[in-house]
């Protein structure tokens, strides 16, 4: 072009005009973008399980084959491999979580609960009028969370054993993992660190 600067500006203007429907300068991590994407008719892909099938969308196949990058069969293979990788990864994470809850957290909490109960008995035997409200509050709370943990663990085991596809792991196993983490995280704030089987968040953040 004779006037490079003008040609560049014209090209930028043309490109912006043609693609303005996908430009968003707000918070892409908030509901603001979800609402805006819906207004623009853009897909809202919430997880990798939802994204992977795009490998074999007609438009994807057409583009990859046109450019000589991959064939339809290769794209289908890649889609299946990615879905299997995801399912395998979540399966490993879930079973690791099950193992840790069953062999580390639950036994440690039981030991702590027994210790608190024994402490209450010892204090009461020494002085019948002693106020053990604090110990009782801890005992009740820890026991309740222990029951929640066991129930969540059973649910996660069932979900993991039944899961067969990436969709199963995403829609059933991941929520079950989150449900197990909730009471365990709360127990970490209650159980004496001497009984807790792994470093706490506080120890990792401030004592390392």
Where are the regions a protein language model picked out?
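An acidic, glycine-/histidine-flanked metal-binding catalytic module
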Residues: 1-5
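C-terminal amphipathic alpha-helical interaction region
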Residues: 12-208
